[in-house]
Structure formats: C-alpha cells, structure tokens
Amino acid sequence: MANVTLRNVRKTYTGGFEAIKGVNVDVADGQFCVLVGPSGCGKSTLLRMVAGLETVTGGEIDIGGRVVNQIEPADRDIAMVFQNYALYPHMSVYNNMAYGLRNRGMAEAEIKTRVEEAARVLELTSMLERKPRQLSGGQRQRVAMGRAIVRQPKVFLFDEPLSNLDAKLRIAMRVEIRKLQRRLNTTSIYVTHDQLEAMTLADVLVVMNGGQVEQVGNPLAIYEKPATTFVASFIGAPPMNLMSTRSDEIKSQLGGSAAEAGVLGIRPEDFVITDQTPAGGVALPLTVEAIERVGAETFVYGSREQEDQRVAATPGELPPGEVIVRIPGTEAPTIGARIRVAAIRPKLHLFSGDGRTRLEA
C-alpha cells in the first residue's frame, strides 16, 4: 500500500493544448479516491499519467514517497483495470489471471496461491477453467479485477471499469468493488463520469472540469456545500436549481448582501409545495410543465413566471426558467397547475456572479 500525491501536475500536448492544468491531489494510504467530471475534463488523462501511460509535462507524481515521473509503468507497482476487459479469449480464467505473474517469472506454486485466493475473494473459484466467452459481462469484469489483485500492487487504478455493463449489473458491481477495496485496504484511484457512482464509491471525491480540480473532499460534504456552480449542477441528480439573485422576485426575498451574491442555488429535495413564504427563505410561483413518477418519489418540473439572467450553462444544468422539485411518494399536482414552492434559509446556496466562489447564505 502507498499514498499517492500529485503536485502541480500538468500535461500539454504538441500544438499547445493544455489537458491538465496544475492539479494537486493527495490520496492517503488505503483511501478510495474517485476522479469525476464530464467527458473531456482530463480525468482519464490524469489517471494514465499516474500509471505512466502518459508523460508528465510539469509537476510531480509521487507514489509511496517515490517520484515516478521517469519510472516505467511496469516498475511503478500499480495495477490497472480498464473499461475494456482485455482478456485473452483462448485462455481460461485461471490462465488469464496468472499470465502477468508468469511473465514476471514468479514460481508456479506462488501463482497458484495468489490466483486461488483472488478467485475466492471474487467468487470465481467455480469458473477458473472457463473461457471468457462462457462468462457474463460482470464475471469478465471480475476476472479483469482478479488479474489486478494477484499482482498485490501498492495502488489500484480503475478507468471507468463499469461503463460496458447494463444498469442493474453496474449497481451490483459497484457494491462489489467497494467491498473488495475495503477488504484489501489498497490505495485506489477510480475514474468515472457517473456522479452517482462517484458519490457511492469514494472516500475522497475529486471533481474535475476543463483539466482543473473544481473541488476535493468527502462526497457528502461536496454535495452539501459545493464550492462552485459547476460542482452544484454536476454533483446531484437531478441537478441543483440555479437562478440569478438579481431578479426583483428573488432579490426582494433575500434582502441585504445576499441579494447581491449573483447566483442562488436550491436542491430539488429542499423545496416544499406550500402557500407560505418561510422567514429568510425563498418562495417561487411555478406552472407545472411535466411530472415524473419513479416510485418512492416524484419529480415536478415547473416554469417560473418571470425568467431571469443566469450563469453560463454547465453540463447537466436545467434550461433557463425551469425549476425541478423532488417530492416523496406519488401524489403530485396536475400538469398546467399553478403552484408555489419554498425553501428555508439554511437550504439556500449562494455563489458569486461568475459561479466560481461559494458565499455564506
């Protein structure tokens, strides 16, 4: 096991495109760190730099107290699991898991011990003689993880390993990966674009955007106190409602310095349908445009009567003038109904006009 430290890490490609812009991240020994962000944000590039598959233009990557910038991937004592299982189709499960160890010249008795132990942990013992074509997608992914486990590395690297699986299997494998990491207690860095996957897996969450780190911290802390409007709209499904504080409707309710903040954010679950306006809070009249019933809860999509200026759109952000409200159960107003929703002061999130700074509500 080992800690991983990224110090002002940069990656610039030929032509001057800067994919990674001075990233600083500390992953403690035994932690599960998740890099999350939209496509093109640089998360997979950063992971490949840790693995040694991409060169480092600037800064340092430290694994277990050793700067590895100039060290070959095979000598970094890491193991990587990819989106593509990359199993040898003509080999059995056992031989797929043993292949890397044999290439390193390990004794066959030690290989057998490691493969059988990994198979036991991953519940693959009964499948060791099967070929990959005889396995389901989830079983193939477990074999790929087993191939990484038998190396007993200091660090596991996961590059969107669940992307090829269907929704039900993704959930099951997500749970299995977390249980496995806790059992092995091996430092792990995991890349995903799925914020739900990120929230449920991570000890420490790194939210990336445009080659930079937007926020680092405990997943729940990031959800409850996003540092920027990008984080607010990316982390959480449905996304946070964001609106200008400078519209007369909101400005008059916030009052004081809060009214000059620039951007107001409210999570869908923090609204209630009510005729009352809470002291210090915000109430909005809406026209119901759509209803989504998903079982235990219902999403109400409404349009505001007066549209306002908004911050620049970010991935997952709601269209201008639209507000989404999450309510428990299946009871909901009818489409076309006029309703009033409100949120109390402690549930309000305020940001600067450019969306880059969180302010006190």
Curated annotation (Swiss-Prot):
Superkingdom, taxonomy of origin: Bacteria
PANTHER family to which the protein is assigned, alphabetical: MALTODEXTRIN IMPORT ATP-BINDING PROTEIN MSMX (PTHR43875), SN-GLYCEROL-3-PHOSPHATE IMPORT ATP-BINDING PROTEIN UGPC (PTHR43875:SF12)
Functional description taken from the UniProt entry: Part of the ABC transporter complex UgpBAEC involved in sn-glycerol-3-phosphate (G3P) import. Responsible for energy coupling to the transport system.
EC number: 7.6.2.10
Ranges in a coiled coil: none
Protein name: sn-glycerol-3-phosphate import ATP-binding protein UgpC
GO cellular component terms listed in the entry, alphabetical order: ATP-binding cassette (ABC) transporter complex, substrate-binding subunit-containing
Cellular compartment(s): Cell inner membrane
Any one Pfam family match given in the protein's UniProt record, by short name: ABC_tran
